[in-house]
């Protein structure tokens, strides 16, 4: 939406490229998560977050867990509670458990965009008073998806290549919503698929896609490098000239 706003303001040249990681822009193709998007349920949810001022991160994580209860709920209930075994040492699970609150205003905006599928039509949404038209976003884009993603089906992520106005490079990685992203080089099981162009039909793209062994991260680094400025020496010290508000990671971590 920010990119469309900049395009409307004639300032899109401030951005060299855009990246969309496991992101759904067309909510008519949102997959299993769309089962939660009926009018009554979402209005009740936004009213609760409005009263509190935020959507609790643990509550949001619980909603997503119930989309895959066998894997994300009962599996651990049997292992940890019934069998008394310790949870597996898995870095992604640890990271996934570190939830973050969402402000009530942002929660409401997300709901409005999703319910009305506002990003698929020019002017369906506004950004700082500017009608949003994704077709005016003409910078190159790098769009990634996970072949086993239950939250953002890869076909839904692929749809973004048709909504944006610039040239897109679509990458289909192994694994699901999180593991397709947290996919560093060195895993012998990792592969990704890529093709030279992005036809309208995702099945047509898949039929012509080439399978590449390894992580997609090096491909992404190359793509970014081709659209970035000249390399400069790294600063000797961290930080900038702005006033420090608090020590990292911030005061929010102490809220209960």
Features from the language model and the residues they span:
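Hydrophobic, well-ordered secondary-structure elements that form the walls
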Residues: 111, 160, 220
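Acidic catalytic loop of the alpha/beta-hydrolase fold
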Residues: 148-152, 177-179
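Catalytic active-site module of serine/aspartate enzymes centered on a nucleophile-bearing elbow/loop
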Residues: 169-256
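Alpha/beta-hydrolase-fold enzymes
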Residues: 3-107, 225-256
């Amino acid at each position: 939406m920010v990119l469309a706003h900049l395009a409307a303001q004639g300032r899109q040249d401030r951005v060299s490229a855009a990246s969309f990681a496991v992101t759904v822009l067309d909510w008519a193709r949102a997959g299993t998560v769309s089962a939660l998007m009926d009018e009554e349920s979402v209005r009740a949810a936004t009213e609760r977050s409005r009263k509190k001022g935020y959507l609790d991160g643990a509550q949001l994580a619980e909603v997503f867990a119930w989309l895959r209860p066998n894997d994300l709920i009962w599996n651990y209930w049997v292992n940890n509670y019934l069998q008394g075994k310790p949870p597996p040492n898995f870095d992604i699970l640890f990271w996934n458990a570190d939830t973050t609150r969402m402000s009530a205003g942002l929660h409401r905006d997300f709901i409005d965009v999703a319910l009305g599928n506002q990003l698929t039509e020019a002017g369906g949404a506004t950004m700082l008073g500017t009608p949003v038209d994704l077709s005016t976003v003409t910078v190159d884009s790098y769009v990634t998806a996970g072949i086993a993603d239950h939250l953002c089906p890869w076909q839904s992520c692929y749809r973004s290549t048709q909504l944006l106005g610039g040239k897109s490079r679509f990458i289909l990685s192994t694994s699901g919503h999180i593991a397709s992203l947290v996919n560093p080089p060195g895993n012998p099981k990792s592969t990704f698929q890529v093709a030279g162009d992005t036809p309208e039909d995702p099945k047509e793209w898949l039929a012509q896609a080439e399978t590449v062994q390894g992580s997609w991260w090096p491909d992404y680094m190359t793509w970014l490098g081709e659209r970035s400025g000249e390399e400069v020496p790294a600063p000797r010290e961290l930080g900038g000239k702005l006033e420090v508000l608090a020590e990292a990671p911030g005061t929010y971590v102490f809220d209960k």
